[in-house]
Amino acid sequence: MDIMNNLPIPMVVEQTGRGERAFDIYSRLLKERVVFLVGEVNDASANLVVAQLLFLEAENPDQDIHFYINSPGGSVTAGMSIYDTMQFIKPDVSTMVLGQAASMGAVLLAAGAAGKRYALPNSRVMIHQPLGGFRGQASDIDIHAREILFIRERLNQILAKHSGQDLETISRDTERDNFMSAERAQEYGLVDAILTHRESVSA
């Protein structure tokens, strides 16, 4: 998994009954039901996340999945494939932002299982309306403008559902880039708790 922008990925060597076995660090963490979204949300990264979620559901449908997010956002359609899968599978998906969860990343953060959405103390969350630009004939521009408005309304509905804010508040607060500290994100309902130590995570 080339998550780290072509940087070398650390390997973990484990002793087994048949000798040593090497895993890249992300594959090893996947064994612990940890999934990462690092960087832009696009079709490639979304397909990786969806595949891992489905695999972990098949492995154990009754055990939580831990989804770590450090993302500036990206493609709405790619992000919605992750969102729909999170809602579709049986295991609870616990979400945590480390670094940033912006745009589609913030939607995925908020979409975690109720009571299991976390932020690290210095992480940042940003919500806004979807961005779009299109050139072409007037009729095509109109079609794309209506699609952007539809997507905006759908994302606002999702944020309202998971945050507990009313739709009017969400619509107003996403009119421009809206950056939040971990504390503000908790107040707003995008996360349930701020973690400083692992021991503070309830079982």
Curated annotation (Swiss-Prot):
InterPro entries: ClpP (IPR001907), ClpP/crotonase-like_dom_sf (IPR029045), ClpP/TepA (IPR023562), ClpP_His_AS (IPR033135), ClpP_Ser_AS (IPR018215). CDD domains: S14_ClpP_2 (cd07017). Its EC number is 3.4.21.92. The active site is at 103 (nucleophile), 128. Belongs to the peptidase S14 family. HAMAP family: ClpP (MF_00444). This is ATP-dependent Clp protease proteolytic subunit. It comes from Dichelobacter nodosus (strain VCS1703A).
